Amino acid sequence: NDGQWNNQKHLYKPAEGIYVAPRAPWNAWNMWFQEPIDKMFEELIQMMIVCKGVNPNKVYLMGYSAGGDGVWRLAPRMADHFAAASMMAGHPGDVGLQNLRNLPFMIWCGAEDAAYNRNDECAKRGKEMDSLQLNCPDGYIHQTHILPQKGHWMDREDAAALPWMEKFVRNPYPDTIIWRQEDVLRDCFYWIS
């Protein structure tokens, strides 16, 4: 956990804003899947708004490798907190994507990143997002990038996610939401509780 965390601190350089690389409080394969993480992110966002003047409608989520696993989990659960999200080299597991209706979402994976069948699973999830958007043209904004001849490390091609995400501003009151609960139960989503 510490090795990847130290790497992530300097991996991306956004053109504007504050870049934060949080460390999970425990060392476990499912470090980002557990319920206390949601509260940690909520409090981190609130502190950044109050202490650093961060615009709450311009908060973005991204993660690489195990952090990408976390994006797969956190983005659908906390879609109401972010303006956009980008997942890099993570495994989706069995997560549902329906809650991403109002959260622009990017998928990045190397075509040769076959550990745990990660490459095929990311491609499948990209097609699932295509299908969701086909049935809901005003939602499910997304891009899927399965990079040929790249493995788990994508030579920073995935950094293209930053300017893409920065184009989006969160709408805290969208006309339509989809809220499906999974492993971690939440007591509210957007304005519904």
Give the positions of each predicted feature.
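Active-site machinery of serine-nucleophile hydrolases
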Residues: 1-50
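Loop/turn elements at helix/coil->beta-strand transitions in domains of secreted/extracellular proteins
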Residues: 15-19, 55-59, 78-84, 101-105, ...
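Acidic beta-to-alpha connecting loop that harbors the catalytic carboxylate
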Residues: 24-25, 111-114, 149-150
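Phosphate/oxyanion-binding active-site loops and adjacent basic polyanion-contact surfaces
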Residues: 33-41, 66, 116-121
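Primarily recognizes the serine-hydrolase "nucleophile elbow" in alpha/beta-hydrolase
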Residues: 57-101
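Short beta-strand/loop motif that positions the catalytic acidic residue
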Residues: 106-110
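Active-site-adjacent alpha-helix of alpha/beta-hydrolase-fold enzymes
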Residues: 111-142
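Alpha/beta-hydrolase-fold serine-hydrolase catalytic core, especially in secreted/extracellular enzymes
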Residues: 130-193
